[in-house]
Amino acid sequence: IEKTMIEAKAVAKIGAKEVVLTGVNIGDFGKEKNENFLGLIKELDSIVDIERYRISSIEPNLLTDSIIEFVAKSDKFVPHFHIPLQSGSDELLQSMRRRYGTALYRNRISKIKMLMPDCCIGMDVIVGYPGETDSAFLKTVEFIKEMEPAYLHVFTYSERNNTTAVRMAGSVPIIKRKERSKILRLLSAKLKRAFYEKNQQQHEVVLFEGSEENGMMFGFTSNYVKVK
């Protein structure tokens, strides 16, 4: 925590207004030093000159009620969570050795939406994982629709040497992987459009990040709506 605080204060001194917390499994932060992610964000919240903190990606099993509740109350931590889903099939999640199922994921999303109705929620989804039947893929599509995220990051499974998955039965044909990827990308576009439309006519503070070739400035609201 101390090292991260030093870095955050240093970027605040040079005028940074938003800090994005990123890393591999950031929800596991501090375990080796008897610290935790909640303790970190509470400390960061005290730095006066940083206006916004954004949590880049956090596993649903590590996104505790305490973290969600703290973000909901904070004036600095923005209402934006990117939460990996990977699949809406519990069988596939177990095969992927994920530490969560759809019930826990649903619980996390419900908690966020109850406390932060305008929160931007993004999801990672993998298509074409070995054993992903048509039925399993349909479960994923229906689960995503039920959760109503703001956007998806869609990844197409590809074989990697020296992994357990490459030796698994139930390989999904490449053409079917591409079809499923297209379906989810189209769904993501619909979800994003719906989220943006929901935020129309809202008064929000925008942090402008730069300008485009036509001279228009662009930036993002706290809940990650791009504004020009």
What are these regions (language model features)?
Residues 1-2:
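Canonical Radical SAM [4Fe-4S] cluster-binding loop centered on the CxxxCxxC motif
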Residues 83, 124, 144, 152, ...:
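Hydrophobic, well-ordered secondary-structure elements that form the walls
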Residues 115, 135, 139-178:
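C-terminal, non-catalytic macromolecule-binding modules
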